[in-house]
Amino acid sequence: MNISTTRRNFLKTTGATLSLAAVAPQIFAADNQSAPPPGKRAIQKAIMWATVGFKGSVADKMKAIRGAGFDGVEMMSHMNHEEVLKARDEVGLEIPSVCGEKHWAKPLSSPDENVRAEGLAGLQQTLRDAKAYGAGSILLVPGTVGNGVSYEECWTRSITEIRKAIPLAEELGVKISIENVWNNFITKEDEAARYLDEINSPWVGWHFDCGNIIRYGDPIAWIRKLSPRINRYHIKEFSLDRAMRTGSPGKGFDVPLLEGANNWRGIIQAIAATGYHGWAITEQGGGDTAEGLNDLALRLEKILILK
């Protein structure tokens, strides 16, 4: 099956519908539009829990994260609430987002309805975890194209399952944020906007990853297109040069922040122009030691203060 051709034909059909975001953008407003509380900067620094690689308890890792200068941490779903909350409160970190643990293994795009049901249950548990931690957003990979799943099937199946979770998201006050990843799905900003348009809920927005998109397009164009529906940002580097030299696209991520292809000054200016107040969450290698965490926090700070 030619996935690219299938996608073009499918998007030609969906593109003929009216863009709801253009008609009523206010209904899609993200949870980032109000002014930050007194004493807090507009964009705060956080790190993805899964990138903190050294051994230790939840409390040990949170202390190291806080000691490095991070304000928050994006937890994984399906963790022990009591342990996480105790460590959070002792250390003084915030939890702005929770990343779903099940969405790759149990994709909402699966042709197997039992797998989709497990994926939906995982999504719903992630929402409950976020509520318990005081997080306003969760990260969701909506599905994958390939292995017998077409672009259209991924689109329709994932939207069907996400809609089933919206009532719980609304009840809990937690937003579902779709992340752009390397899943052969939604590689253009116009596609992302149409996807959110079709879901048509203020409880579903975007979790934009600046590094993942470099392989396909311009992060700044994505930011401008999807604002104000971006709830959270992943700050991650990618080197096109390294990816091409090694012949392995994944090797492009093996580069420190500020040393890849991202135009960070332009990205920060684009984010500021949208009026975003919220979280920049680093999903970057290097967090295997306290020294590595310190370096990540310093590099993230250098990015955020660019004018």
Predicted regions and their residues:
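N-terminal pre-domain/capping segments
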Residues: 2-132, 170, 201, 205, ...
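Short acidic/histidine-rich active-site segments
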Residues: 279-284
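C-terminal "capping" alpha-helix adjacent to the active site of nucleotide-linked donor transferases
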Residues: 271
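Acidic/histidine-rich catalytic cores of soluble enzymes
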Residues: 66, 98, 163-261, 265-268
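Active-site acidic/histidine proton-transfer and metal-coordination neighborhood
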Residues: 14-22, 109-205, 215, 265
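Acidic-and-aromatic substrate-binding clefts and catalytic sites of carbohydrate-active enzymes
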Residues: 52-57, 72-84, 107-108, 146-150, ...
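A structural motif
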Residues: 70, 135, 230, 276-277
